[in-house]
Regions:
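Conserved AdoMet/S-adenosylmethionine-binding subsite of the radical SAM
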Residues: 44-192
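Canonical Radical SAM [4Fe-4S] cluster-binding loop centered on the CxxxCxxC motif
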Residues: 1-37, 41
Length: 192
């Protein structure tokens, strides 16, 4: 698996993310060619140009930057990644990670837009199943809470019919029985 970035830095300041430690925060979004070059350089280094039995079998968009803030470039990259004359990765060989933006793009929520226009696996960075704690870990939760995220994830599933991955880093303060019960409750509502 290769992990790709969509920007240089990130201004979301998620507490558990190494990118949040960069002093300048978001420097800029990456261009399509810069996103693509990450996998091209790795494939070239590994001599991984076979059409079957690839060394890099899957790719995750989980590096620096929030996918939802570079959608147009990400969409073009994913088209290249999926195209059988280019990188030739199927939709289930690519996972796009997001903190769960519920803002709008072209009259759709970002998550719904990703489902309609990108059509890959989606991974949601949750990291706490309790809003008050997620507010501290991931300040974007104050704007887009878990409660606002769940209906958007259901829409994503209806569009793609792909299960949604829940990302949850085990931290000292998010492993209680209360957290586990809240996480189970969320996962019962979201096809994951």
């Amino acid at each position: 698996t290769i992990c790709l970035s969509v920007s240089v830095g990130c201004y979301l300041s998620c507490d558990m993310c190494a990118t949040a430690q960069i002093p300048k925060k978001l420097v800029r979004n990456l261009s399509v060619s810069e996103i693509t070059s990450q996998i091209i350089l790795c494939k070239e280094y590994l001599k991984d140009w076979k059409t079957s039995d690839k060394l890099i079998k899957t790719q995750v968009i989980m590096g620096q930057g929030e996918s939802g803030y570079n959608l147009d470039h990400l969409k073009t990259y994913i088209e290249i990644a999926k195209h059988n004359s280019a990188l030739d990765y199927g939709r289930t060989r690519i996972t796009v990670s997001s903190v769960g933006l519920c803002s709008k793009k072209d009259d759709l929520s970002v998550i719904e837009w990703i489902g309609k226009n990108i059509d890959t696996y989606l991974a949601i960075s949750l990291h706490s199943s309790i809003n008050s704690q997620r507010d501290k870990l991931m300040p974007i939760n104050k704007k887009f809470s878990i409660d606002s995220l769940i209906p958007e994830l259901k829409k994503y599933y209806e569009i793609t019919k792909l299960p949604i991955f829940i990302e949850y880093i085990a931290l000292e303060d998010n492993l209680s029985e209360e957290h586990a019960k809240a996480l189970v409750s969320i996962m019962k509502k979201v096809p994951s």
